[in-house]
Regions:
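Noncatalytic luminal/extracellular "stalk/propeptide" segments of secretory-pathway proteins
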Residues: 25, 34, 41, 45, ...
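Extracellular/luminal Protease-associated
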Residues: 70, 116-212, 268, 381
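Catalytic-core environment of secreted peptidases
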Residues: 45-63, 70-71, 81-87, 159, ...
Length: 485
């Protein structure tokens, strides 16, 4: 059994069931005071790094990754479950199915020249020799979201070329397919490749669809004919979430704290998202399964986040109306130790006026909790948009307030941010994002420690109260707020 000793702070001692009075008995497990200050002091950098070392070793033993549906992910589940059970939690690992997509061949040729193209997830496959057809571009100013955008044009058997934006990729290829197009090429609407994107699901996908850069889009449109080859496969895979809840605290104001456990297939996923996993896990271990808290805390470790937030979406979809009503808030932790780290709190009040609107009522208060905690640690946090790229998405969708901290992914750090946080301006927060270099060696340990303490603090604060200046709607106010949403 693992023993945690917290010097200089109040602790709660739980003698685990089954201990005897003999000299062979297991020693008492020591838990932290289950509030913001107590938990933030107890969640140490060394403990977080210890979990990351275990996850990295798991990846190394399983083809270098911990992706959903693989043995590496299953071993990661086993590790987290064993840790939680050692702290007395009753743990469930509900299974779910999801579709996995892989592109074996991705080529686009015009006049003998190869142009980089990337298959959008769930794109149907072309014949092995590809599709050779004339090019028909959406008229200038048209976005390809409606059949009227192609008025007067003959798409039958053609490769439709449309700009990114306005409507989902799936809608663009559906419109082109309805007009008889053989394939679709979507051109990025900003510099750089269009190397990720999805058609939604296999049922939505109608015709082979790839993405090209803004720079290459002009050449494609100017070509009379192109050959597109996308050899792809879509398979049904099973994965699991991990759920563990305290036996104490109100079940009418549940605090859900989550992190996705899976990596991408390309690497071990130690920052993304071993760091978030380690912080949520260590907070659970320090809190224990029966802490003296006002509100129950539900710890969640999501599967298949990298495949489209699948685990968290399946979980929320499976909740009854009462289940959703009884969740006071959701705290999300996805990447907290980026190599060129930022200190970001989800912009619950939309004060930054960037991207998506404010989160559900109470999200502004959650943002304040984390901003204030980081400020107490000498860090002036910035906001980060609820852009739908992590597991808060399904919770926000049903009106549950959300928040958390984040150290940045593929966005660039600004000069102003580098001046106040250190690091390198005009470079991405994590150049190792979704690569085989997402390793412990490339985790910013100072950011891991500060953000890890903030994770524990936020969970502890709301475990004790979801009301007050930084509280969220409760009772009738919650009903009203979610009805309006």
């Amino acid at each position: 059994m693992r023993i945690s000793l917290l010097a200089g702070s109040a602790v709660t001692v739980l003698i685990l069931a089954g201990c005897s009075s003999t000299s062979d008995e297991e020693p008492a497990r020591v838990f932290a005071t289950p509030d913001g200050p107590g938990l933030s002091a107890a969640v140490t950098e060394d403990a977080l790094v210890g979990h990351l070392q275990e996850l990295e070793a798991i990846a190394a033993a399983h083809d270098g990754n911990r992706a959903a549906g693989t043995a590496g992910y299953d071993a990661s589940v086993d590790y987290v479950v064993s840790q939680l059970e050692s702290a007395g939690f009753e743990v469930t690992t509900p299974e779910f199915e999801f579709e996995t997509f892989e592109a074996q061949t991705q080529t686009l040729s015009l006049a003998g020249t190869e142009i980089p193209v990337f298959a959008l997830s769930y794109s149907p496959t072309t014949p092995a020799e590809g599709i050779t057809a004339r090019v028909v571009g959406a008229p200038a100013g048209a976005d390809g979201c409606e059949t009227a955008d192609y008025a007067g044009l003959d798409l039958a058997g053609a490769v439709a070329v449309v700009p990114r934006g306005v409507c989902p990729f799936g809608a663009k290829q559906t419109v082109a397919a309805e007009l008889g197009a053989a394939a679709t090429i979507i051109v990025n609407n900003e510099p750089g490749p269009l190397d990720s994107g999805t058609l939604g699901d296999p049922e939505t996908a109608k015709i082979p669809t790839g993405g090209v850069s803004q720079e290459d889009g002009a050449a494609v449109l100017a070509a009379p004919e192109v050959t597109l080859t996308l050899v792809t496969t879509t398979d049904t895979t099973t994965s699991r979430n991990i759920i563990a809840q305290t036996t104490t605290g109100s079940t009418e104001n549940v605090v859900v704290a989550g992190a996705h456990l899976d990596s991408v297939p390309e690497g071990p996923g130690i920052n993304d998202n071993g760091t978030g996993t380690s912080a949520v896990l260590e907070t659970a271990l320090q809190m224990g399964s029966a802490p003296e808290v006002t509100n129950a805390v539900r710890f969640a470790f999501w599967g298949a986040e990298e495949d489209g937030l699948v685990g968290s979406t399946k979980y929320v979809e499976g909740l009854s109306d009462d289940d959703k009503r009884n969740i006071a808030l959701y705290l999300n932790f996805d990447m907290i130790g980026s190599h060129n780290a930022g200190y970001l709190a989800y912009d619950g009040d939309d004060s930054d006026k960037v991207g998506e609107p404010a989160g559900p009522a109470g999200s502004d208060a959650i943002e304040r909790t984390f901003v204030e905690r980081l400020a107490a640690d000498g860090v002036a946090a910035d906001g980060t948009d609820f852009d739908g790229r992590s597991d808060y998405g399904p919770f926000i969708e049903v009106g549950i307030p959300a928040g958390g901290v984040f150290s940045g992914a593929d966005e660039n750090k600004t000069a102003e941010q580098a001046a106040k946080w250190g690091g390198t301006a005009d470079q991405t927060f994590d150049e190792n994002y979704h690569t085989d270099q997402d390793t412990l060696a490339n985790v910013d340990r100072a950011a891991l420690a500060k953000n890890g303490a903030a994770v524990a603090y936020g969970i502890g604060v709301y475990a004790q109260s979801v009301e007050g200046p930084n509280g969220v709607p409760v009772g009738a106010a919650r009903e009203a707020a979610r009805a309006e949403g």
